[in-house]
Regions:
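Hydrophobic, aromatic-rich membrane-embedded alpha-helical segments
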Residues: 124-148
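N-terminal signal-anchor/start-transfer transmembrane helix
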Residues: 17-37
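Hydrophobic alpha-helical transmembrane segments of multi-pass membrane proteins
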Residues: 14, 94-101, 129
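Transmembrane alpha-helix/helix-exit interface in multi-pass inner-membrane proteins
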Residues: 52-72
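Short aromatic-rich membrane-water interface segments that cap or initiate transmembrane helices
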Residues: 6-11, 79-94
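Membrane-interface helix-boundary motifs at transmembrane edges
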Residues: 32-45, 115-119
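Membrane-interface interhelical connector segments
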Residues: 67-85
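Hydrophobic transmembrane alpha-helical segments in integral membrane proteins
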Residues: 2-23
Length: 157
């Protein structure tokens, strides 16, 4: 049975499941940000444990096929090295899982932080959707909205 699970979860299947798997979390964040569902499943550590498990599985799978992990450190040497790394599907999955996990973490943080300032949940839908698609711009958009509700700029919160 373990062999069947291992052979089922190809890189393409993992990619599909990661993309589909985070959609319920984002739906809860956007539509029900103040619900118990959001507190238990999304703004907690729960989704990050799931994505960490996927990350570890991809690393394990990479190790079994003899992936050269040392080449990952060459990405800091220049754009040509980075583009060479992106030719490998396993590296893309490692990167994509990392990207999805960080964006979901930022989305959860935005929801928790917006509740401290009682920001309208309809207004919060915009930066959350943008964070899902392009994380840093969604975070910037949230900070702009947050300034108006907090009535101050604080770089340390």
């Amino acid at each position: 049975m373990i062999e069947q699970i291992y052979t089922y979860f190809t890189i393409e299947i993992l990619y599909m499941w990661i993309n589909l798997g985070v959609l319920p979390f984002w739906f809860i964040l956007i539509v029900f940000p103040q619900s118990h569902l959001s507190r238990i499943f999304v703004t907690s550590i729960f989704p990050l444990f799931i994505l960490s498990g996927v990350y570890i599985f991809i690393l394990y799978k990479s190790y079994l096929i003899g992936y050269d992990f040392d080449s990952n450190f060459t990405l800091y040497l220049g754009l040509s090295e980075l583009s060479r790394l992106f030719e490998d599907h396993l590296y893309i999955m490692i990167f994509w899982t990392h990207f999805i996990a960080i964006n979901l973490f930022i989305g959860g943080w935005i929801v928790k932080d917006s509740q401290k300032f009682s920001i309208n949940k309809v207004l919060m839908a915009v930066p959350l959707i943008v964070t899902y698609l392009i994380g840093p711009i969604g975070l910037l958009l949230y900070w702009i909205i947050r300034i108006f509700y907090a009535k101050r700029i604080s770089l340390y919160e």
